[in-house]
Structures are given as C-alpha cells and as structure tokens.
Curated annotation (Swiss-Prot):
Provenance organism: Desulforapulum autotrophicum (strain ATCC 43914 / DSM 3382 / VKM B-1955 / HRM2) (Desulfobacterium autotrophicum)
Gene Ontology terms: cellular component: ribonucleoprotein complex; ribosome
Family (UniProt): Belongs to the bacterial ribosomal protein bL31 family. Type A subfamily.
UniProt KW keywords: Metal-binding, Ribonucleoprotein, Ribosomal protein, RNA-binding, rRNA-binding, Zinc
A molecular function GO annotation: structural constituent of ribosome
GO biological process: translation
A Pfam family that the UniProt record links to this protein: Ribosomal_L31
Co-factor note (free text): Binds 1 zinc ion per subunit.
Gene field: rpmE
Protein name: Large ribosomal subunit protein bL31
Cofactor or coenzyme needed: Zn(2+)
Matches recorded under SUPFAM superfamilies: L28p-like
Amino acid sequence: MKKDLHPEYKRTMASCACGNTLEVGSTRDEIKVEICSKCHPFFTGKQKLVDTAGRIDRFKKKYAGFDAAAAAKKK
C-alpha cells in the first residue's frame, strides 16, 4: 500500500453566519456556512427570507421585460 495517499482527516469547526458553531470531521481547517439547523426555517418553524447578495432582485430585474415582450408578441 502507498503511504500518505489519503488527506489528513481531522476534527474542525464549522461556523454559521448566525454565530452557531459545530464540530465536524473534515480535511479542511475551517468551514463557513450561511445557514445551519439552528437558523434554517425548516428546523426553526419560522419562515424567513434568505436572500444572498440580492439574488431575488437580480432575478426580477433580469426577467422583468419578458412579460411585456410576450404580450406585445401576441398582438
């Protein structure tokens, strides 16, 4: 068998944007996540809008003209 074939698997801390930290096993030194089980709407029972960097606004802006263009095309 070859030696040093697999990466080192160690205990590391995963930190959430809400401030929660979890100890997990990984090959990385540090893990940062945007949402975890303490702040995710499915687990908390509260509905919350999660908009990362204005994705909803960009989507609405990108596709805003399609309804008008489709209506004009039908006429």
